[in-house]
Design a protein with these regions (language model features):
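Conserved acetyl-CoA-binding loop-helix of GNAT-fold acetyltransferases
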Residues: 76, 82-96, 115-123
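Conserved GNAT acetyl-CoA-binding A-motif
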Residues: 99-109
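Conserved catalytic-core motifs of GNAT/GCN5-like acyltransferases
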Residues: 107-110, 127-144
Length: 166
């Protein structure tokens, strides 16, 4: 929990999520315990440093089984950003979402000024589906939030999972 909490307290993470204040470790511990009891699908992102796996992020799918869709959330440690790990982790998570969980659509929200995140999501197969006007804050200023989504047909093959099936 402390590792994830540290990543979330990074100023760039706070800005990227549009939060105005950090969260206490106690509150985050309760929040993670609640999340782990739910139906969320979580994956830890690892970076192979000198051949040793080191956790550097997490991806999460928050499924809505009644309509076979899920919200997507990703968080990377500050030291893991800009290396392509977020895009790779997003592609793998989408592969799982579409080929194992059989979701029909995955969506996310991102603050419009967060251009690096928008580009990474586009590289992974997401498209802008709409704009939530004045829905967030970026560096203390009101900003729009983009709604992005992707379908199985939007995600480029190859699938890591498909070859494993008989």
């Amino acid at each position: 929990v402390e590792t994830y909490w540290r990543w979330e307290q990074d100023p760039a993470s706070l800005i990227g999520y549009g939060r105005q204040q950090p969260e206490s470790l106690e509150a985050r511990t309760e929040g993670i315990a609640h999340q782990l009891r739910g139906d969320n699908i979580r994956f830890t992102v690892y970076h192979l440093t000198d051949g040793t796996p080191e956790p550097v992020g997490v991806t999460t799918l928050l499924p809505d089984p009644s309509v076979r869709t899920a919200e997507y959330v990703v968080m990377l440690a500050p030291e893991a950003r800009g290396m392509g790990l977020g895009t790779a982790a997003t592609r793998l998570t989408l592969d799982y979402a579409f080929h194992i969980t059989n979701l029909r659509m995955v969506w996310l929200k991102v603050l419009a000024p967060n251009k690096p995140a928008v580009r990474a999501y586009e590289r992974a197969g997401f498209r802008t589906a709409g704009t939530l006007r004045q829905a967030g804050y970026w560096l203390g200023q009101v900003c729009d939030e983009l709604l992005m989504d992707t379908l199985s047909s939007d995600v480029s093959p190859p699938s890591v999972i498909s070859p494993l099936m008989p």
